[in-house]
Structure formats: C-alpha cells, structure tokens
Design a protein with these regions (language model features):
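Short, locally clustered residues in the helix-turn-helix/winged-helix DNA-binding domain
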Residues: 16-23, 86
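A short, conserved structural fragment
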Residues: 54-66
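Short acidic, hydrophobic short linear motifs in intrinsically disordered regions
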Residues: 24-37
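Short amphipathic alpha-helical interaction segments
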Residues: 40-55
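Short, amphipathic alpha-helical interaction segments positioned at domain boundaries
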Residues: 76-90
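Short alpha-helical segments that sit at the start of domains
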Residues: 1-17
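Minor-groove-contacting beta-hairpin "wing" of winged helix-turn-helix DNA-binding domains
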Residues: 66-74
Length: 90
C-alpha cells in the first residue's frame, strides 16, 4: 500500500491529468485504464485515489467490476479547485 505522501501525490496527479486532458470541461472524461497507464499508478492506488476524490466531490467515477475506474470526470468543484490552483501559480 502507498504511503501518505504517495497517496496525496496520486490524487494531485489524477486531478491535474483530468483537468489538462479535458481542458476544464466537466462533460468530458478519461477512461480509467488510460489514466492508469498514462500516470503509471498501480490499479489499487488509482482506485483509492478516485474513491477519495469522488468522496470530496472533485470527480465522478463510473466503475467497472473489481473496483476499476471505467470513466473519470471532473465535477464543477474539481474544476474550480484546479482553476484556483492555476491562478495561484500565475
């Protein structure tokens, strides 16, 4: 199982990848397998990151059997958070 720092990093990487791939459009999503392969996150850690982010209402997840994300999308709150972080960085 991942350490706390790794889990936090996975969550940030998922949010960033979603925001960049969808250009902040909540109607678009990314297949979970593509997200896992692109980010090279272990399957169980990706599932844990998605579960956490969905619980925070930052993403929505359509699940496949076996706790594998089928499709992952940003919510309005997720977009707002990513835009606020982008503004802070300048």
């Amino acid at each position: 199982m991942a350490t706390l720092r790794e889990r936090q990093g996975y969550r940030e990487r998922v949010l960033t990848a979603l925001y960049e791939a969808t250009e902040g459009n909540r109607l678009l999503g990314i297949p979970g397998r593509k997200l896992r392969n692109d980010l090279r996150i272990p399957e169980e850690d990706l599932a844990a990151a998605c579960t956490y982010l969905a619980g925070e209402e930052l993403i929505t997840v359509d699940w496949e059997p076996g706790n594998t994300p089928a499709m992952v999308s940003l919510t309005h709150q997720g977009i707002r958070r990513m835009e606020a972080e982008k503004e802070e960085r300048g």
